[in-house]
């Protein structure tokens, strides 16, 4: 009899704790119709991040509590992240931490390196000016026996999976390796 007086409250408290824990971390917190969405995050732009993610969340306040507890907000990374429908706050944070998703960059024959830079900049975070500077970098050109007239030859028309947050140098070096 005394055993039941202890067991019932302990079980009730445990159940309350488990339900609260589930609701806090794992209860679905997305509010969009598609099966998934892509979220573009810039590391040092907290206002844009808040604006872009808030429209996809049922509860922004609880998401930020979980994100803070999991140390995401202090360690936010730039990238393109896929968020699936019907996932909880914990899974959203894990997607934002670990699931940087590449974009498909396709280009055909370009007559000028400026055109190529403009085309690629539509798919990645960096602008065409930054890409053009990387393509025309004197040290890079010298090290690879290239010049401004023939640098376009390293860009083979095709489709490539590139991370949205790739630097111009990363992209250029990837094209050289291809």
Q: Where do the model's predicted regions map?
A:
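Conserved catalytic or metal-liganding residues and their short signature motifs at active sites
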Residues: 2-178
